[in-house]
Amino acid sequence: MAKLRHIAMQVPDLEKAAAFYEGVFGLRRLKKVEAPIGNAISLSDGVMNLTLLHFPEGTKRGKDGPHWAGLHHFGFVVENESVTEQEIKKHGGEFFMQLPTYPGVDAEKKFKDINGVVFDVSEHGWG
């Protein structure tokens, strides 16, 4: 069975958002990534991964510009990405994109569900 282990949220200020989740919920900072496609801070409670994303002007990866905040995507850890991809398509979902490889960036495949909601599948997880 797939396990929900990753949520990504776009925020206008990475450090401010990270300080909030670290301070309020005791989440632990795993890593910070600055890449040409955008910047991220990964936090965890030991089971779930919360990745905070910020996409500066010109990166074209964020929703509605760099000041928008909200759920960006979520992810499932699966045993077999290929089998899961077949099931996604069988149930009406579709492939969305493969992230380019950059140091520190988890290059998982992204899909859209039947309503257009973006999610990742990964055999290795995040963080």
Segments and roles (model prediction):
Residues 1-16, 71-76, 122-127:
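N-terminal beta-strand motif that seeds the catalytic metal site of vicinal oxygen chelate
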Residues 2, 10-50:
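Core segments of cupin and vicinal oxygen chelate
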Residues 8, 28-34, 98-102, 126:
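Conserved catalytic-core motifs of GNAT/GCN5-like acyltransferases
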Residues 38, 58-63, 97, 104:
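A short, acidic/glycine-rich surface segment
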Residues 42, 85-127:
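Vicinal oxygen chelate
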Residues 51-53, 120:
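Conserved beta-strand in the GNAT
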Residues 70, 74-88:
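Mid-chain, well-packed structural core segment of small domains
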